[in-house]
Amino acid sequence: MKILVFNVRITRIEIHLSVLLLFSYLFYQGWILKLHTWQIITACLILLGSVLVHELAHVAAFSQLLGIRSQVLILAVGGAAIPLEKEPTCRGWRFAMVALAGPLANLLLAVLAVIVLVASQDQVTFNLALTSCLLNVVLGVLNLIPSRPFDGGHMFAMLLEELLGHPRLADFFARTIGSLCGCLLMLASYYLRDPFMGLGALASLWANSPLSSGRS
């Protein structure tokens, strides 16, 4: 079920109802930290905007590097679905750069937030810039983890395939490293008592297991 639909140039953005689960988690964390309601709502909106920029960077990279356009972007709690007008025929470094585009966009947003942070002259601007910086750093770094379904996992798999020239061997190494990262994430979620990190760890372990579908 969609809760919001709008267009960014030729791309139709559809935000799924499940995104509210992520917002519920943020409200829970904000309640634990004793934040004001307006602070939590602001963080939710900044996060939503940052995720949209992340996914639109992928859409732009698909178009510029692979010549493939997407007219729809479906944003849900586990990430985004980007239906393409045709399947890409090339993989290798170009595909890896498409995967890198999202995290890179978040890190660039974090840099811009730092600039605003340094130049800010009032507390409201300072808080907004700080929140934006922290959220974008988390999004960028998390997605650089070399484990599918994170962008870093897709990038790592594509670069391995380009380097080794043997798709099955590259996939084996990518799954092995990805599974190890999933186990480390699971341990981190246990010690930090972070259920969302635990869900990310489970997604990582599943995406890199022999039971999941072939290469992503």
Give the residues covered by each predicted segment:
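Hydrophobic transmembrane alpha-helices and their immediate loop junctions
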Residues: 1-216
